[in-house]
Amino acid sequence: MHSSALLVLLCLWPAAALGPSDADHAGVCPNQLNLHLWVDAQSTCERECHSDQDCSSSEKCCTNVCGLLSCVASRVSDGSSEGQWAAGGSGGSAVSCEGFECRQQGAVCELWEGQPVCKCQDLCGSEPSFTCASDGLTYFNRCYMDAEACLQGVELSEVTCRFHLSSPNSSPLPQDPTPPPAPTDADTQTSAPTLYSSPQQQVTYLGGTVSFHCDVIGQPKPEVTWEKQSDEQEQVVMRADQMFGNVVITSIGQLVVYNAQVWDSGIYSCVARNSAGVLRADFSLSVVSHADQDFFDDPAAGLPLGRPFSPADCSAAVERGDCGEKRVDWFFDPARGSCHTFTHGGCEGRNRFHTFEECRASCQREGQAVCSLPAVQGPCRHWQARWFYNSLTERCEAFLYGGCSGNKNSFGTRRECDAHCPTHRPRPCRSCRHRGRIMDTLCSSDFAIVGQLTELIQELDSGMARFHLQQVLRDEKMGLQLFRTQHLEVLLPQVDWSCPCPNITQLQLPLLVMGVVQDGAAILLPHSYARPVSERRLMKIHEALDKNICGTLRRLQD
């Protein structure tokens, strides 16, 4: 036992003798502390390092998915600091966080192995105090904003809340000819998402690592999600800081595929949304086997020197027969006018290509896919007002072009854009109707409130409305009166924003809102009640509630 203790002391002595500048930084890499923090440790391939000394004092040099090392925020083990200090302290001298300053917003001091270190705060109060931040998001309170700033390693500030009460595209479009707009301060004007540079198409060998960066810009900062296009399985929405098999979405919205397999080939779509609009950009990945010796035989053309090719091959039926090992290749779809992946059993078909670029160069006519390209601003600052066709909204929209490194989905006028791309013609909207009489609706609803709409967030086919509560008329499941709730967030899970029901996009008066509660969340369905309130209608509802009309109706139904 004495020899074991002596061995421990001998092992600890060299580390204690090292100066602060020679030792590793305090803490551990996120994935060493908790496997669920793996993505955070892999969050970037850009801040390369060789040791902890290349990073700031609150960071560690950790492994990333690119096979290199990157600086990331160090982590400490919750509740372990006292035990570590009790075992490792010397001379009984008290070490504390007093006077130790954490410069990163949202970081707090804790003891780690007897030394004060900074860590991101992970506990915030439950009292709501909605805080609008400079990243365009609204946080439950300021503590949550500070914690997010620490996790991202950035600075966030509280800003004046901006409420978006109208449809993203309801403002009148600029008239032709469009005058060149003057650049404006991004903090004072919203702008729909645009790409800084055009999407890149990539090819990798089996087992390789590739990454796609959706360098989207916009105000407020767009939220980035990824989807892999597939006709054979349901599409999965991939969000930041998540891992899907061998695919990782980093904290900056970068998609990384490591140990690439043939089934990873395909088109990965980046979807960027903010309150001003939505954008989609497609990135193609082709995974080829080392057995395909001829793949890079013609580096100048980038095409393999294989079988003879005929233009008729592009319209040939896809051969999916079973002739051996399953493979994933590309084919040209004449109906969609673009290239896509398909799985086959190794049979030699005519409409079959190893890579997206081979398929595109062989079959896709010049200008055929222009209308599916995203809006690209480019790195220059010679601002021009241009128009592009948005394949998600199916209409031409204005964007700000920097003057260089764009693409062909950029037109000088709206008329030119409409003539080149198939613009969607909106159908006339029918008036929204709720089911039954107002008293029946009141009694069948889980909640009924009178509130002022303060914020409306619109997604592609869903949304969220925030109300400032003025009266709680009925509440069966949420305890709004018990907790003295002042704000209520209501989910809109099924909305056609071209003809929304209930239509609250243009209403700025106090509303009478009735809906249901599912899993603790307030929800408005297409047939739910949401209309401006009148004193007369409100008086009748109060009278009905005082007389317990809902209880009477329930007994009659039973």
From Swiss-Prot:
Residues 193-286 form the Ig-like C2-type domain. It comes from the Eukaryota. The keyword Magnesium does not apply. Residues 114-163 form the Kazal-like domain. Disulfide bonds join C29-C62, C45-C66, C49-C61, C55-C71, C120-C150, C124-C143, C132-C161, C214-C270, C314-C363, C323-C347, C339-C359, C371-C421, C380-C404, C396-C417, C429-C499, C432-C501, C443-C550. SMART domains: IG, IGc2, KU, WAP. Residues 174-183 have a biased composition (Pro residues). Residues 167-194 are annotated as: Disordered. It is found in: Secreted. GO terms for molecular function: receptor antagonist activity; serine-type endopeptidase inhibitor activity; transforming growth factor beta binding. Residues 314-363, 371-421 form the BPTI/Kunitz inhibitor domain. Residues 421-550 form the NTR domain. Residues 1-17 form the signal peptide. Residues 22-75 form the WAP domain. Protease-inhibitor that contains multiple distinct protease inhibitor domains. Probably has serine protease- and metalloprotease-inhibitor activity. PANTHER family: ACP24A4-RELATED, WAP, KAZAL, IMMUNOGLOBULIN, KUNITZ AND NTR DOMAIN-CONTAINING PROTEIN 1. This is WAP, Kazal, immunoglobulin, Kunitz and NTR domain-containing protein. It comes from Danio rerio (Zebrafish).
